[in-house]
Regions:
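Aromatic- and carboxylate-enriched substrate-binding clefts and catalytic-loop regions
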Residues: 135-379
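Disordered, acidic Ser/Thr/Pro-rich linker "stalks" and the adjacent N-terminal cap
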Residues: 432-439, 446-455, 621, 641-669
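Carbohydrate-recognition beta-sandwich/jelly-roll modules
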Residues: 1-130
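Surface-exposed, short loops/turns at beta-strand junctions within beta-sandwich domains
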Residues: 606-612
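Solvent-exposed beta-strand/loop surfaces of large extracellular or lumenal domains
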Residues: 27, 31-38, 503-529, 587-598
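Active-site-proximal substrate-binding groove within the catalytic cores of carbohydrate-active enzymes
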Residues: 57-58, 62, 291-520, 525, ...
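Acidic, Ser/Thr/Gly/Pro-rich low-complexity segments and short DxT(G/T)-type signature motifs
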Residues: 550-557, 617-647
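Short, surface-exposed alpha-helix to beta-strand junction/turn motifs within ectodomains of secreted
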Residues: 566-594, 619, 633-637
Length: 670
């Protein structure tokens, strides 16, 4: 409801912010302009004692209320200072990347296709230079929702397996006969962590059945009001805590996708939770106090297990209060579909997807005015998977690049990649993804401070994001419409630029240009207070980098290799542009082009002989700030890229220093 989703927000009064550190507090400013912050408990001292909410000497202490002074009465400044306070009490949430199985096979996952997807994704990531994922995640489809005694439905074999639920709780279906052991071991072998989806309310397909299974077993209750599990029942939260602890102990789970909580308060007084209060607030307070205890217990267990990057992602039906960040790392944006499209002039998939989700950001920030850091929003992007999306072969490499980079300027720390490996095989998308993730992580200290500029794209308006950290900035701009439009903004504190930039020169570099037709005068300079007006073509997107420091370092060649008898690949330490002119000694160059991720130059030559050494020279390249790249290097072509081969001990130098053994003898050894 509108009432529940607005709970736990701060109040701004002139140059101050006020609020309660419990995220389910009612905060409002009434018609007389009086601000109220109300915490609803409804508990007797006996109940407080039962729920371990009294001090050791029998006293009750309420949640803390906070008041803070900001540097200005300007709302943007108050918000920035309030977020600084939130950051000081929040659990640490660094830039994070992980792979999730959902849009690959949705609920039809099993041991085999999870193993296949994980292996293919890791291979693609590692071969394109991506650091190990923080987590590989198994989404919904592992739980057994089947029970003939509580449901009259036929077993859904593909999604839930063939057997009945026998424990009366969350349990593995027979598609996962060894639990998460194969998947978690595989993730560990990649140098990554392992993540798990759990739907507290029972998921979204069998929530009623799961609620009845749990109630029949005595581990919780079925909520008839919402047709799902009663997530506030203390028996359920206690049993779920035990289940989570077992998972962390057994599989070192470092990510919990907690998908779906209470949509309405349960009014059944026979359930093990509070009822009553204004709008059922006794229920909501009691529910979230129980879950906060669960979060704290799991974090303590994570420390015991050496899990140093445990992440809680709270998804649907969670009011976006910034005070949840004391325990959780990210919260679903709430006002959006998982995947949505809106067409406002451009009908390409990249345009429809960006216009929809960015429109939801404008609704969240500008219309509803939720005070929640954009860095901690879970937005369900990027999605480029085969199931339920109709996205296969629907993005060119340039569109995929634009999709990722524009999303990056929203500022989120949390990158859960909803990919299918065969779709990332299209074109050069592995390399584009790798370059993007490297850029986003490197610039996260800037991107996380994103502010919206322009107006909502779902009405066809120009818009973008402005991100700043000290003397560095990144600004994105996009025109979603079918006509030429302008975007204007002032480079000042309202878009996040620090006032300390006054009088200083900012060097501007183009990071992305999509559908740009005019010849940009690049490497320009701008200053604080300048009014920036940009003319954008239909569907055009641009991203600028701004800094007081000027880049004067030329691109450096980091790798040169012959990948085939007619192909030479040159890799640079940064993105390069231009039209390469190349020569290869003893061979003709028939084609020279910059790769889609702009980190490589690919040369096609006449046939090279095995073992031949050639000299490669390339000119006509520069980095994004205009520094020229000079390439003059030697490359040796080795057939099938085999440098040396040994088939017997006698083929080796110092053969006496080598011990022959077998795989069996090495088993269990490091």
């Amino acid at each position: 409801s509108g009432y529940v989703i607005s709970l736990g927000q701060p109040v701004y009064i002139q140059g101050m912010f006020l609020g309660c550190e419990f995220p389910m507090t009612e905060t409002e400013i009434d018609s007389n302009k009086n601000a109220h912050m109300r915490y609803f408990s409804g508990k007797t001292f006996e109940k407080l004692q039962e729920d371990n909410q009294l001090t050791t000497d029998g006293k009750y202490v309420t949640w803390q209320t906070v008041a803070g002074a900001a540097r200005s009465t300007d709302m943007n400044v108050i918000q920035s200072d309030f977020y600084e306070y939130i950051n000081s009490i929040a659990t640490r949430s660094d830039f994070r990347t992980q792979y999730n199985s959902w849009y690959d096979n949705m609920m039809t996952i099993n041991d085999d296709n999870i193993e296949s997807a994980f292996k293919k994704m890791e291979k693609g990531f590692s071969e394109s230079g991506v650091e190990p994922m923080d987590s590989y995640v198994v989404d919904d489809g592992w739980n057994n929702y089947n029970n003939s005694n509580t449901t009259s439905t036929v077993h859904d074999v593909a999604r839930c397996g063939t057997t009945d639920n026998v424990t009366g709780f969350w349990e593995f279906n027979n598609k996962f006969p060894n639990g998460f052991r194969p998947a978690s071991d595989l993730a560990e072998s990649f140098g990554s962590g392992f993540g798990v989806w759990v739907g507290p309310r029972g998921g979204y397909n069998y929530n009623a059945a799961m609620g009845k299974i749990i109630e029949k077993a005595g581990f919780g209750a079925y909520n008839a009001v919402t047709d799902d599990i009663d997530v506030g029942d203390r028996r359920y939260v206690t049993k779920l805590t035990e289940f989570f602890l077992q998972m962390q102990d057994a599989y070192k789970v470092n990510y919990w996708k907690l998908d779906g909580f209470a949509t309405k308060p349960c009014t059944n007084a026979n359930h093990k939770h509070m009822t009553g209060g204004k709008n059922g607030m006794y229920y909501f307070s009691d529910t979230w106090e129980a879950w906060i205890d669960l979060f704290e217990t799991l974090r303590t267990n994570a420390e015991k297990n050496g899990i140093d990057n445990l992440w809680f992602n709270l998804t649907c039906y969670v009011n976006p209060s910034p005070w949840y960040l004391q325990w959780a790392n990210s919260i679903w944006i709430q006002n959006s579909q998982d995947i949505g499209r809106v067409q406002v002039g451009q009908n390409r998939q990249v345009d429809q997807l960006l216009s929809y989700r960015d429109g939801r950001y404008f609704d969240f920030v500008k219309e509803r005015e939720f005070q929640f850091p954009l860095a901690n929003i879970y937005n369900h992007d990027p999605i480029y998977g085969k199931t339920g999306t109709n996205l296969a072969n629907q993005m060119t490499d340039d569109e995929f690049k634009t999709y990722l980079y524009m999303m990056g300027t929203r500022g989120t720390a949390f990158w859960e990649l909803y990919y299918s490996p065969e779709m990332i095989d299209e074109g050069q998308k592995w390399d584009i993804n790798a370059e993007y993730l490297e850029w986003a992580k490197k610039n996260y200290h800037i991107l996380k401070n994103a502010k919206l500029i322009g107006t909502t794209p779902d009405k066809g308006n120009t818009y973008g994001y402005s991100c700043w950290d000290g003397e560095e900035g990144i600004i994105s701009m996009r025109n979603p419409s079918a006509s030429v439009k302008t975007l204007s903004f002032t480079l000042d504190r309202n878009v996040g630029a620090a006032e300390s930039l006054k009088g200083k020169t900012l060097n501007r570099t183009t990071i992305l240009d999509h559908k740009t037709t005019d010849a940009q005068t690049d490497y320009q300079t701008v200053k604080y207070g300048d009014v920036i007006t940009v003319t954008l073509q239909p569907g055009e997107a641009r991203i600028w980098s701004l800094s007081t420091a000027k880049d004067t370092k030329a691109p450096q060649l980091t790798l040169a290799k012959a990948t085939a008898d007619n192909t030479i690949e040159l890799t640079f330490d940064e993105r390069v542009t231009g039209t390469p002119a190349a020569t290869v000694s003893g061979a003709n160059v028939t084609k020279a082009e910059v790769s889609a991720n702009q980190r490589k130059v690919m040369l096609t030559t006449s046939t090279l002989s095995a073992g031949s050494k050639v000299t490669v020279s390339v000119s006509g390249l520069k980095d994004l700030t205009g520094n020229a790249a000079a390439v003059n290097t030697e490359v040796v072509y080795q057939e099938n890229q085999v440098v040396a081969k040994a088939s017997a001990k006698t083929d080796l130098k110092n053969a006496n220093d080598v011990t022959e053994t077998t795989d069996e003898a090495l088993a269990g050894k490091t």
